[in-house]
Amino acid sequence: MGSHPYAYLHYGYNLGGGGTPWNISELPSDEDYPEWIPSWIDPFEAADIVREQCYYDLVEERLLAEVGGFRERRADHDKSGYYMRRHAALKRVGIELSGHGYMPDSEIGGYVLHIYETSVQPLDPAYAVDFASLEHRRVEEEWDGRLDQAMSALQITCTQPAGWLLVASYT
């Protein structure tokens, strides 16, 4: 594997993809190994858009617009306060897409759409997790509802329920 292993604890959806099959219901049914093409992008330009922007950027932009109410385009970055407004919107959304698995040449094992993340790294390999506190936060902060809102904005349904995911990455 890689020379820098990391373990991440997420609360969210395991979307699959990368080197594994997608765990998304909205996939083309006429392909042996279907790729997720987001329904909100032009299908004729989809392959180029996914290759140029990658799923991380596509998902972030969509969640910023649909969940965070931030519709300024990146081209507008010269406006005064753009990055402060963008950062505030990202914080409001509170959900992001992460990759996991072995990442040679940007190949990944899959994607997780998550609302919570903590990690264990080689310098601090033991990390105590207070699951009772996290479960309290999950309920109080309505993580499931917020994740469902994000999935609705992305116009996808995961074939697996949201939950706690322990994933490894190697860089």
Predicted regions and their residues:
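Core of folded catalytic or high-affinity ligand/protein-binding domains
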Residues: A162-Y170
